[in-house]
Design a protein with these regions (language model features):
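Solvent-exposed alpha-helices and their adjacent loops that cap or buttress functional pockets
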Residues: 43, 62-66, 71-74, 134-136
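Adenine-nucleotide phosphate-binding core of ATP-dependent small-molecule kinases
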Residues: 101-143, 147-186
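Structural motif
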Residues: 49-50, 68-71, 81, 141-142, ...
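Glycine-rich phosphate-binding loop and adjoining helix at the ATP-binding site
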Residues: 3-62, 108, 155-176
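Short beta-strand segments
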Residues: 1, 52, 71-77, 145
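Glycine-rich phosphate-binding loop plus the immediately following alpha-helix
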Residues: 30-58, 87-128, 181
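Gly/Thr-rich phosphate-binding beta-strand-loop-beta motif of the actin/hexokinase/Hsp70
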Residues: 67-91
Length: 186
């Protein structure tokens, strides 16, 4: 979801009672919109907290701190984060961008589609997505992580370019620690 300075702007998966790909509950949508998650957690836990999305935490654990670095996480849907010079850039809810046949990236490359297509076809789809996004973002380095990154075939990875790196899902743990020193946009 989209979080700015610990405040929820949008969180599509928590606005439904039954999880992803189900109907949005207007009452939950209203309750989450503008919710200061970071402050609420700090008060409840009686300690400082930092609230980021999954791709931002993942990226905190892997970025080099040099240049324009993009992080994509593949799981239930698509996580997305941008870092420039080691600083976290404002969030883009790229997963909700339309991609094909009036569908979003979340749906087009998410877990449901991976299971439906099988890993080989899904992996080619990821390669096509990377090829299409390269001229838009012109990253110095693209990191692909998340639970489904392991499903990308080596043949497809080899065709993505040297600036594309698959990173382990465990990077999120290191990112959780490093997030405390991560510079953010103002």
């Amino acid at each position: 979801g989209m979080i700015r300075h610990g405040v929820v702007i949008s969180t599509p998966h928590y606005m439904t009672k039954s999880g992803p790909r189900t109907k949005i509950d207007p009452e939950l949508q209203e309750q989450w919109s503008g919710f200061d998650m970071q402050n609420a957690l700090s008060k409840k836990l009686e300690m400082p907290t930092r609230v980021l999305n999954d791709a931002e935490v993942h990226g905190a654990g892997i970025i080099s701190g040099s240049g324009y670095e993009v992080v994509i996480t593949l799981g239930t849907g698509l996580g997305f984060a941008i870092f420039y010079g080691g600083s976290l850039s404002p969030h883009i809810e790229f997963s909700h961008a339309p991609v094909r046949r009036a569908t979003t990236y979340d749906t087009w490359i998410g877990e449901h589609e991976r299971r439906r297509l099988g890993n080989a076809f899904w992996s080619r789809r990821i390669r096509a997505m990377v090829d299409e996004l390269r001229p838009v973002f012109m990253w110095d380095r693209l990191y692909i992580g998340g639970g489904n990154a392991r499903c990308i075939r080596q043949a497809d990875l080899d065709r993505m370019g040297d600036e594309v790196v698959i990173v382990p899902n465990a990077a999120g743990v290191a990112g959780g620690v490093r997030a405390w020193t991560l510079e953010q946009y103002k």
